Amino acid sequence: MAIRYIDEIESLKGKKVFIRVDFNVPLDEHQNITEDTRIRAVLPTINFALDAGAKVILASHLGRPKGERKPKYSMAPAAKRLSRLLNKEVQLAPDCIGDEVKKMIDAMKPGEVLLLENVRFYEGEEKNDADFAKALANDCEIYINDAFAVSHRAHASVEAITKFFPVVAAGFLMNNEINYFEKAMQKPIRPLVAILGGAKVSGKLEVLESLVNKVDKIIIGGGMAFTFLKALGYNVGKSLVEEELLEIALTTYTKAREKGVKFYLPVDCVAADRFNPEAETKVTTIQEIPEEWMALDIGPATVTLFTEALQNAKTIIWNGPMGVFEMDAFSRGTFAMVSAVANSYALTIVGGGDTDSAVHRAGEYAKISYISTGGGAFLELLEGKHLPGIKVLEENGK
């Protein structure tokens, strides 16, 4: 991808540098940030711009305020946390557009940081509105996209805004995301193994169709496995099944086998009599799931099967948990897979909020080669799609 990066720009000194970041971080009921990985991930880009003598203007969204100004979606907690991480004052603008914001930007000195208020307080952001994008650019001189996680969205601060800058480039986080993706999917060291989990096949269908043509092995866990198992003729009790996708699931499975791709599905599970942390549970083979019970995690024999499938892997990509890991009774399968992936000798790439969360909860994140900050963006790249945010970076490349 012929993308220009921030360290390839001739000079940032004294320039107003607009950086699109993704500070869409989880908050508790008191508006305290509970996890700040996404803020930490862009520190190298922000620090590089500051060290180069730039005036740094940051823009982000938080939550889904749907075009309305709602205090609970203010960027204030992010400004506070960033200030602590940078060890310097980060001013929070009262808005993201308008005269007052413009005055604040014009008054900035090199080495100062201003965080704009939530860009999604305006409908124009999600509508990719050119007028809103122009107002948001605030006459800044250089645009940097370091928000991989929203680069699959054609939104004003990601796509339309680039038309109003003479210089457009990407940050270091974007560079990492693209580099690791290319290592895994375009120039992989084989065998290449994909692990897919999560509740539904429908959300991963296009990913699967793309992966069948690229990988050596596919491992399917989580709720989505039971649509495949039912399609193959198993009685899966009350387990989650997308009936309308049975035929497509069977076609995908058959296509993979025809292409010589090894396709792994659970052989046993942790079944429960209801969807509840207090449910009665038991380990059962797939053939013996009781009629009124549901499978909510992979079982120990499946963990062994999946772990053995990873033994000779040289590249592993993983998206989606193996069970309802938020409930302790159904978390063992996911955590066992975290351990198997973390302790493999392969290049390991994990993407998606739930999988990321599981890796952190297991305390194994340091052993994973790369944890992507993107959920939807990561999946769309796996699908082989061109992301709007990356496309405009390529068009404005070197």
UniProtKB/Swiss-Prot annotation:
Q: What is its EC number?
A: 2.7.2.3
Instruction: Name the domain of life.
Output: Bacteria
| Pathway the protein takes part in | Carbohydrate degradation; glycolysis; pyruvate from D-glyceraldehyde 3-phosphate: step 2/5
Asked if the keyword Nucleus belongs to this entry, the reply reads no
Q: Which reaction does it catalyse?
A: (2R)-3-phosphoglycerate + ATP = (2R)-3-phospho-glyceroyl phosphate + ADP
List the InterPro entries.
Answer: Phosphoglycerate_kinase, Phosphoglycerate_kinase_CS, Phosphoglycerate_kinase_N, Phosphoglycerate_kinase_sf
**A cellular component term (GO) from this record?**
cytosol
Recorded hits in Pfam families, A to Z, give: PGK (PF00162)
Kindly list the GO molecular function terms attached to this UniProt entry.
ADP binding; ATP binding; phosphoglycerate kinase activity
Q: Where are the transmembrane segments?
A: none
Write the record's keywords in alphabetical order, separated by commas.
ATP-binding, Cytoplasm, Glycolysis, Kinase, Nucleotide-binding, Transferase
Gene3D superfamilies documented for this protein: Phosphoglycerate kinase, N-terminal domain
User: A biological process (GO) annotation for this entry?
Assistant: glycolytic process
Q: Where is this protein found? A: Cytoplasm
User: Which residues does the annotation say bind ATP?
Assistant: 204, 326, 352-355
Where substrate is bound, by residue? 22-24, 38, 61-64, 120, 153
Family to which this protein belongs: Belongs to the phosphoglycerate kinase family.
Quaternary structure annotation from Swiss-Prot or TrEMBL: Monomer.
Q: What is this protein called?
A: Phosphoglycerate kinase
Question: What is the organism of origin for this protein?
Answer: Geobacter metallireducens (strain ATCC 53774 / DSM 7210 / GS-15)
